[in-house]
Amino acid sequence: MTNKVRFVPGNTEVEVQTGENLLNIAASAGVYIHAFCGGDGVCGKCKVQIEQGAVVSDRTMKLSRADFEAGYRLACRSRVEADVVVRIPDQIRRDGKALKQKPKTTRAITARTLEALVGTWDVSPPVEKRYLELPPPTIDDNVADMRRLSRAISAGCHDCKEPTYDHPELLRDLPFLLRKADWKVTVILLRGKRVEEPDRIIGLEPGNTTSKFYGLAVDIGTTTVCGVLIDLNSGKIMAEASAYNAQIGYGEDVISRIVYAQRPGGLKALQEKVVYTLNNVIETICKKVGINAADITYIMSAGNTTMEHLLVGLDPKFLREAPYVPICSQFPLTRAAAIGIQAHPSVRLFLYPSPASYVGGDIVSGVHACQLHKSAALTLFIDIGTNGEIVIGNQEWLVCAACSAGPAFEGGGIKHGMRASTGAIEKFHIHPDTYEPMVVTVGLAKPRGICGSGLISIVAELLEAGAIDQRGKFNRQLDSPRIRDGADGYEYVIVWAKDSVLGEDIVLTEVDLDNLMRAKGAMYAGYVTLLESVGMTFADLDRVVLAGNFGAYIDLEQAISIGLLPDIDRGRFFYLGNASLLGCQISLTDHHRFRERVEVFKLMTHMELSENPHFMGHYMAALFLPHTDMSLFPSVRAKLAG
């Protein structure tokens, strides 16, 4: 159910889901409300007046009885339950004009948008469960047990090839299981990789277990491991869970982990940690649904090249040494139990292929999900992160590259940077006269630090307000106690110590700004260099797809303002969220789409940006906000001029 919210003065109107938080709504709509406790309810500054309609909100000590009866509420403590008109008390500037509202950026992935990108898929998984009642052997029919099983599987299918089998454990257990089950069994079949290949018997269970048929899609991230359980009979998502990758204790980025893997016992420790994390995700999911891990029939996974190597116990040593070569690009089918994963003993682990050392299976999975290999639309596919990955192309060709953006987007190298967890500042607006902030945190909790989306938001707002210049330097002439000379040079105080969890001021420093500009500069230089390598520019693009959880939370206008994304028609941008996980879900459910994985991989040509002589020039040009060439950012130039 949706409701309309109109903010006055300014008459900014948005449509929102019933129950959404009013402070979050205002921040997403570009409406400034004075608030600096992150939405924790302790500063009392986000006072608004409900002129029409109603919100659900309790009176707090920050509101007098008279104010409450007059319709005043704290935005951070109010949920929209009907159409409302909200008056913001401090919306008048010193010149008497109402504050100009920012363009609203819609980030939600609607079902229609998702279908336009990824299409539809069937519920016809690559693994099949089939219940069989076999005739017991007799003197007249005393064929081998495996022959009897294969014959029953092929019965009624004239064109089918007799299924194969691939592991001795199956033969060892087969005669005892068949007889104990009175010849009534459920066979688990893996469809042939190609239409002409026979199916493969990978498991056998006593009785009829076809109702318990589950698959697990997994994104093995450097920071987080995410899993989705799917009922393979219906295609329905049953549960989701995620956990921090326990490898973090050995290093926060892939380079640190590759280095650690070279220590005695390091590779084994890293593999055990990622398997431990995956097992925790499986355990959480199974508890939610009320099933056993043994009910999971197969696992489809993707991750960057380092994570995929470590998961199956392959040494990633040569990924970081020129000429940056992985051990393999297409990983062999692996029995999950053999590497310690808790699932059915017959479960196979499928991994998406990785084109290069720093362009992994997670990107192939994302490209596969949004069907670049089937679309005539020329697409720029971006996964923003420490190791920014880029793909350009369509159904005829695909080129891919990675650019080392550094950890700024994930909180690394930022004085008060952190991952996007509770208390992280994720949205920010600034008053153009007083330079006082509007701060919204993840979970509307007391501020703890700044996550990647918050960093982009803060820098974009400071730039537009004139608090920093295009070199990323603070305007030292401004009359504001929040801009000061700190221990690491000039800085802006986002949250005072008394309002933060840390008990110290949360600040953004000029060093932080430098690190952000290097990160966004590397990404932008990557787009331009890769486009140039195929003789194209941003004008040739039909669409830009932002993948990854981070991409789903950044504000489009603010990302363009700092030069992280190109200044092109906003209608060409699409948000896909965790595309890697989505690709795994599709392959898990539809065997036709499953078979396309390798086609996508083979279509992708990798380019090494570090070897391109033009990359460094584009990188240096992008070390400005938004860029040294403002003609590339006409909308930002107009905002900064006006």
Feature annotation, model-predicted:
Residues 218-222, 227-253, 317-333, 365, ...:
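Glycine-rich phosphate-binding loop of actin/hexokinase-like ATP-binding domains
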Residues 293-304, 459, 538-548:
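Short glycine-rich phosphate-binding loop at a beta-alpha junction
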Residues 394-396, 536-600:
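Catalytic phosphate/nucleotide-handling subdomain of diverse soluble enzymes
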Residues 304-318, 536-539, 548-567, 609-618, ...:
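Short glycine/threonine-rich loop-to-helix capping motif typified by GTGT followed
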